[in-house]
């Protein structure tokens, strides 16, 4: 009788390598290991072979860089999505693509279940489980690391007992996740929020001390909110992001040290490196300021915050994400132009922007000759704008005077105390 099959999100690390054998021993599954290339720079040929070596029935590698950039990173960029105003959702965004690919392969292979290597303490378990359920409500979900509850030493002992290769970097004190949108680093000394992150925690960015002394200016072209060219060179989005990671990272741009509120109810200290994300979000936002009407520019940040929360909290495959993203897309119709950014010693600074859809009028803004603003119209506008305030003051004159007298009395008492 054929065994049931399960599709495992496989990274090549210790946890998911042990999971292959554990799933076989515990559930008698045939394991199909799936690794996605989302721009993390891993040797996926090695990862693919390792899964088979450990005992997977089949090992599949998917080049998902373009899909990740176009379908997940781009909507987040158009929304300037930053969880709690700091984190560009590096890991969160990739989980939804991984979930979708796993379910697609599971359905194609006739698998009855999917599995991931998340612990019971993090956000990713929520993102995976909720996404799997949204994409296929009937599929079974197994989380080996969450289930087995082993210590690190017990896991290593299991690996040795079953001839599972132990990664050579196992003594690395950090837990790292990386894709083309950035890199996250936690654990080790970083668990102390008072301790400064050591340089060893960083990889994509130079320290300010080591960054070039001379600033570098770059130009980013956007078409309806999408970056399409870097310094005049048109590039696929994934390639543009990876190239910008190197350029901005060389100048130390994109280091984020953040104590964030996890979905599971705890606070965690994370160190992120997001050179391209930091630069692109900055440039995109500035182009929006140039091309969007005031009401849109002032309201959109509220929607941006909601989308960031939805992405962080595992709700990509939900009606709220669809609705919020539809609004964001509507705001991008005229966000087309070029932004010039100066990179220097950890800073990305917008120093120029231009657009055929610019709502900035030099003739209306200038204080020099050629000023076309109707200064005389200001008086009538001010009278109408301030009319509700004037009426309120007239109706509530006694209350206003009472508050005024109270304030004066308090000041007098303070002066008396000083004397």
Swiss-Prot record:
Pathway: Amino-acid biosynthesis; L-arginine biosynthesis; L-arginine from L-ornithine and carbamoyl phosphate: step 2/3. Its main location: cytoplasm. It comes from the Bacteria. It is found in: Cytoplasm. Keywords: Amino-acid biosynthesis, Arginine biosynthesis, ATP-binding, Cytoplasm, Ligase, Nucleotide-binding. NCBIfam families: argG, PRK00509.1. Homotetramer. This is Argininosuccinate synthase.
